[in-house]
Amino acid sequence: MRLLALLLLLSLAQAQRLGVIGDWGADTPGRAQVAALLRHEHAQRPLTALLTVGDNFYPKGAVVETFLRELPPVPLYPAFGNHDAPRLWEQLRRFLLERPYYRLRVGGLEAFFLYSEDGLPAQRAWLEKALQASTAPLKVLLLHRPLYSSGLHGGSPTLRSLLEPLLRRHGVALVLAGHDHHYERLEVQGLLHVVTGGGGAGLYPTRPPVPWSRALAVAHHALFLEVRPEGLLGYALDPGGRLLDRFLIPTRP
């Protein structure tokens, strides 16, 4: 983890632009295409780091170094999903992490990673303390299972009841998740949620959009986040570079 932090500090001398992928680590053309998109974007304007929302390696979590080598040469900070669970210990060791939940500061943004497969009550207690201690103007939560989604899995009522009051109380600006293999932006009482599960695994159709849905695409993609003085700019691109969605979250005063 110290080595990753050092690499991140070195890359902060450049623009603070993050790539986000989810449900990506499958031996498919989609994964290779998204990896090529990330390399292209990094060559155009360097990425500070890559973040994931889990399902990093299919089918049972065993690390595939070839997949990692095809990504841009920047630090990678993962969340972990249900497909990672059988080999979670291996991934924690590979990414130099002591546990599957942690926090990461990138300039004016602080990212909080949770493990949605197990141990949520203890993680909630940790998250509350971490959010209370955070001085970041922009707070982002990453986890695998979404709170809201129009996908076949759908949103988790358990996660909503456990986390929503906490997220609102501490001014979290964005929740990033995967699990459903599509792109979707939703807004629920002012809190933005993005499902970014199109990193390479097979796509599947969605249900009719839920009332909070603001943008939806069944496509492989990567999400990009730019930390700017005026706020957090987000945009999703498909492997051909086509813009699927764009949003701006203003920095809180």
Residue ranges and their predicted role:
Residues L3-L12:
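Sec-dependent N-terminal signal peptides
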Residues G25, L114-E117, V195, Y235-G241:
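Secondary-structure transition/turn motif
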Residues D23, G54-D55, G81-N82, H144, ...:
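Active-site glycine-centered loops adjacent to acidic/histidine catalytic or metal-binding residues
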Residues L18-V20, L50-T52, P78-A79, L141, ...:
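Residue-level marker for buried hydrophobic side chains located in beta-strands
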Residues R214-P253:
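A short C-terminal boundary segment appended to hydrolase-like catalytic domains
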Residues L12-V63, S149-S150:
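N-terminal active-site segment of His-dependent metallophosphoesterases
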Residues R39, Y58-K139, H153-L174, D180-R228:
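Extended active-site neighborhood of metal-dependent phosphoesterases/phosphodiesterases
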Residues V20, T52, R105-V106, E187-V188, ...:
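Generic beta-strand structural signal
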